[in-house]
Amino acid sequence: MKITGCPLKVLFGFAVCVSATGIVCAQNAGTNGVPVHMVVTAEARHGSDVPEISQRDVMVNEGHDRDEVTSWIPAKGDNAALELFILLDDGSGINLGTQLDSLRKFIMAQPASTKVGIAYMQNGTAKVAQSPTGDHALAAKALRLPMGAGGANASPYFALSDLVKRWPESAARREVFMATDGIDLYYGGGDLQDPYLDAAIDDALRAGIIVYAIYTPGAGHVGHSYWQNYWGQMYLSRVADETGGESYYIGFTGGPVRFDPYLEDMENRLDHQYLLAFNAKPQKKNGWQRIKVTTEVPNAELVSAHRMWVPAAPQ
């Protein structure tokens, strides 16, 4: 995959410059702030019926300050474009191999607006078996059994960063479904200070990429190490939560019996996403800003990244 320059695109109703890092930078930032954008998922607090959310129902806060919401568009119809990478750990055990039919079924059920890519985690890199394509049968054909060699992928977070950095920019939503044990053999685990995990989260946030993660045991000794698998699942939960995605399966006696219910949940989330644009507070320097996207619509909750990389306002 090759990342190109900084093309102008019309996105969410205004002209923006999409950089090679995925930052949305202001072309003519006014006194109201710096235009930025993100993908937000709506979910039901109770039950399965997700309420419809309108722009007037959305609030964006940076700290104690309220930001102006300039656009809120359902990711449907002409705005439904999605690029979805399925990123599989080549060091996974036999459990992942039993899930390939579920993954093929999921891929073949995707709408025409979704392009699916396949990649494998190997030695800290993402080996792309199929670039995102609208030919879902071609994407499904790229699935194969994992190598199943313990340590084949020493850090899933190196691989995630590698995928994110080499993923060409697009006006479509970009999201990842990664299946791995989450164990970072480069760092060793045992706390939440893993710098490679932090870097992967930062890379995904800068690119505006949402990550979904499901635990599947690795091959070899680590596949039945309780404390390693505990921390691996904590890491997966964190990368998903901080990027606005979801993590699946907390267990220590093997992987999930079937991926199907988790894939169905992810599909439901993809079907209830919105394209949000708002004016962030002008800053003198590029930097991270913590944000919170909320709504007061009954039985509705908005899920998004916890922070955004906001470019400095033009001087």
Model-derived regions: residue spans:
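N-terminal secretory signal peptides that target proteins for export/translocation
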Residues: 1-6
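Intrinsically disordered, low-complexity proline-rich regions
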Residues: 7-9, 148
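Bacterial N-terminal signal peptides
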Residues: 9-22
